[in-house]
From Swiss-Prot:
Changing residue 367 to R: Reduced transport of inosine and thymidine. Residues 330-348, 508-527 dip into the membrane without crossing it. One of its GO terms (cellular component) is plasma membrane. Residues 43-54 have a biased composition (Basic and acidic residues). The keyword S-adenosyl-L-methionine does not apply. Keywords: Cell membrane, Endoplasmic reticulum, Membrane, Symport, Transmembrane, Transmembrane helix, Transport. Changing residue 602 to R: Lower concentrative capacity and altered sodium binding capacity. Induction: Up-regulated by phorbol myristate acetate (PMA) in HL-60 cells. This is Solute carrier family 28 member 3.
Amino acid sequence: MELRSTAAPRAEGYSNVGFQNEENFLENENTSGNNSIRSRAVQSREHTNTKQDEEQVTVEQDSPRNREHMEDDDEEMQQKGCLERRYDTVCGFCRKHKTTLRHIIWGILLAGYLVMVISACVLNFHRALPLFVITVAAIFFVVWDHLMAKYEHRIDEMLSPGRRLLNSHWFWLKWVIWSSLVLAVIFWLAFDTAKLGQQQLVSFGGLIMYIVLLFLFSKYPTRVYWRPVLWGIGLQFLLGLLILRTDPGFIAFDWLGRQVQTFLEYTDAGASFVFGEKYKDHFFAFKVLPIVVFFSTVMSMLYYLGLMQWIIRKVGWIMLVTTGSSPIESVVASGNIFVGQTESPLLVRPYLPYITKSELHAIMTAGFSTIAGSVLGAYISFGVPSSHLLTASVMSAPASLAAAKLFWPETEKPKITLKNAMKMESGDSGNLLEAATQGASSSISLVANIAVNLIAFLALLSFMNSALSWFGNMFDYPQLSFELICSYIFMPFSFMMGVEWQDSFMVARLIGYKTFFNEFVAYEHLSKWIHLRKEGGPKFVNGVQQYISIRSEIIATYALCGFANIGSLGIVIGGLTSMAPSRKRDIASGAVRALIAGTVACFMTACIAGILSSTPVDINCHHVLENAFNSTFPGNTTKVIACCQSLLSSTVAKGPGEVIPGGNHSLYSLKGCCTLLNPSTFNCNGISNTF
C-alpha cells in the first residue's frame, strides 16, 4: 500500500510527524516551559485508484521523565515475568509428579493417624478399642479392594478348577448341604427348647407357616427358584445367630446401638437453641422430629463422601453372591438398610425402565420391609431398644429378597449386568457444606409428612373408636374399638411369631396400627408399654393388661420395623412412577403384592428373632409361690424372687383390706412375697391376715 502525506497547517503543539525520523521525535517544538510536549499524528487520508481502505497512524513523543517511567515499568514487568516463570515451573512439576506427591501426602497423613491410634492403645487399650477395631476394619477393606482390583482375574483362574468340580457334582451335593443344615437347626432347636422353653418352637412353626402361605399365593408357584429364598432365610438366621446369640456379636451391636443413641443426642443442642430450654415439653415436635433433620444431614454428607455407596456395594455384592439375585435387586435391598423406600431406587434409576417385573416387585418389597436411617433415630428416641432396631434393619434386607422371589418368581432374563448395576451416581453437591445444607433442606418434606400424618391418623383413630363405640353401644357392647378389631384379626399372626398368648392380642393391635396407619403410631404405643414396664407399674389394672413381656417387646420391635402400610403404598407408586414413567402400569399392578410381601418379610424377621431370643420364658409362678413358703421348701431363690416381683407389680390395691393379687395368685402367696422382699413401693399392711 502506498501512503501520501498531505500538508496541514502548523499549530502550537501540533505537527505532522507520521513519517519523520526518530531524531525529530526529540525535537522540542513548544518553548513555553512545559516539562513534556506530546506530538500527535495527523490523520493522512488518501483515496487511491485501487480503492484501498483508510489508514490512521498515531505517534506519541516521550520526554526524559516519561522514559524513566517506562524503564521502571520494564523492570516491574521483568520481575513479574520471573515470578510467573517460577510459578509455572512449580505447577508443571506438580502436574508431572502428581501421583507421587499424592502418595507422599497420604502416606504422611496415614502415618500420623497410625501413630495416634498406637498412642491411644498404649495409654488405655480398653478405651481405644473401638478406634482400634474401626482402623483394622478400614485397613482390611482397603487392602481387599486393592487386591481384588489388581488380582481378580488371577484369583478367578485359580478357583476355576474347584468351581468346575463343584458344578459337576452340585445336583446331589446341594441336597446333602441343605439337609445337613436343616437337621442341624432341628437338633439345635430341640436342645435350645429344653433349656429355654417351648416358645421357640412356636416361632419356628410361624416361619414355616409364612413360607407356605407365600408359596400358595405366589404369582407363579411352579416357577419358584429356591436359591434366593433359602439363602435369604439362611442369611437372616446367620445374622440373628451372630448378633443375638454370640457374646461378641451382641456386645458389638449393643455398643453400636448405644453409640448411635449418644450421637443422636447431639440434636438437643440445636433443638434447645431454636425452641428454648423447655423444648422437651413438646416431646415429639421438638425432640423427635429434629432428630430426623440431623440424621438426614449426616446421611447426605456420607453420601457426598462416597462412604454410603461403598457400603451399599459391599453388602449388595454379598447378597448377590449368596442369594443369586440380580444385581439391581441386591443393590436396592442393601441400600434400603440405610436409606428410605423412595431414595434407594435412585441408586439404580437409569436402569428402572429395563428391569423385569419380578425385579420391580423385589425393589418395592425391599422398600416396604425396611426403614430409613433417618426415622431409625426417631424410633430410638421413643425408647425402643436401639440394638434390636439396628439388627432388624440388617436382617430385613435378605428377608425382603426371600419373600419377593417366593411371592413373584423371576420368569424373564434380567438385562442389567453386575458391572452396570454397581455403578452408582454420587451426590450432586459441590462440596461437603453444600451436601449438609441439601440434606437438612431435603428433610423438611419428610418432617412435615411425619407430623401431618400423625395428626391426621391419630385424629382419625379417635373418631373411628368413637364411632365404633357408638355402634357397639346399640348392642350393649360399648368397648368395641379399632384396636379390639385388629387384636382379633392379627392375633394369629402375632402368636405364630412366638409372642406369648396373653400378649398376642396387644401385639396384634400394634400390627393393626402399623398396617392401616404407620409404624410411628405403633412404636409410640409400644414405647408407652416399655416405659410402664421399666417403671414397675402394675401389669393389670381392673383386669386390663397394661404392658407386655420383654420377649414380646423384642418380637414386636422386629415385626413393626418396616414401611409396609397403606400410606406408603401411594408414596412408592408415585416415587417410582416419576423415575420410570414407562413402567407406570407394572408399578401399579405389583404394588399391592409388594406390600403383602413386605409385611410377611417383617413377620419372618420377627420369627427368626423369636427363635433366637434368649429371654427366658415365664416361670410357672403359681406352683413356685404356693410351695415356696412351706417349711419344706426354701424361700429365697432366684425363681421365687422373680415371681414375687412380678406378683407385686401386677397387684391392685383399692384400699385398706381390699387388695387384688395379680395373675390370679392367692393372698397367701402375696403375703409371703411381702415378708420375703419387704417392698418399699407397695404397702403390705393392707393385706388381710385372714385367707
